[in-house]
């Protein structure tokens, strides 16, 4: 019973195949946003990026078959377990507040263009 309860809080290690798939997504997209469709911070992120460029990729973790595993892989790779999880030019940016801070400092547009 204890192992079952523990499984709610501890995810098993992510397979190398899933990690490779996530890395491939990061490497093949200039702007990549992992998000959940119901998340208001994710909507803010999409709106801001859309205002700068139409060229970005979104992965909706809550509708993806491997969404939970992908989110676990992202946590292992970046230390971030929340969404949105944003990458620009293969660099991990962080979440919406990090993106908004870059915009406020005038540093986002040069990254996107």
Task: Kindly give the residue locations of the regions a language model identified.
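N-terminal targeting signals for export/organelle localization
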Residues: 1-13
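Folded extracytoplasmic luminal domains of secretory or organellar precursors
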Residues: 15-18, 67, 98
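Local sequence-structure signature of Cys/Sec-based thiol-disulfide redox active-site neighborhoods
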Residues: 18-59
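Short amphipathic alpha-helices and their capping/turn residues within compact interaction modules
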Residues: 27, 31, 54, 79, ...
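N-terminal G-site of the GST-like fold
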Residues: 43, 53-82, 88
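Non-catalytic, surface beta->alpha helical segment in thiol-disulfide oxidoreductase systems
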Residues: 88-113
């Amino acid at each position: 019973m204890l192992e079952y309860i523990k499984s709610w809080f501890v995810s098993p290690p992510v397979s190398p195949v899933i990690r490779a798939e996530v890395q491939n997504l990061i490497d093949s997209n200039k702007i990549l946003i992992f998000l959940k469709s119901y998340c208001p911070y994710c909507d803010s992120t999409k709106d801001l990026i859309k205002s700068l460029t139409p060229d970005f990729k979104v992965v909706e973790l809550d509708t993806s078959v491997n969404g939970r595993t992908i989110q676990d892989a992202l946590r292992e790779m970046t230390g971030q377990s929340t969404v949105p999880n944003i990458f620009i030019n293969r660099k991990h940016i962080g979440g919406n507040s990090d993106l908004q801070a870059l915009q406020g400092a005038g540093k986002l547009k040069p990254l996107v263009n």
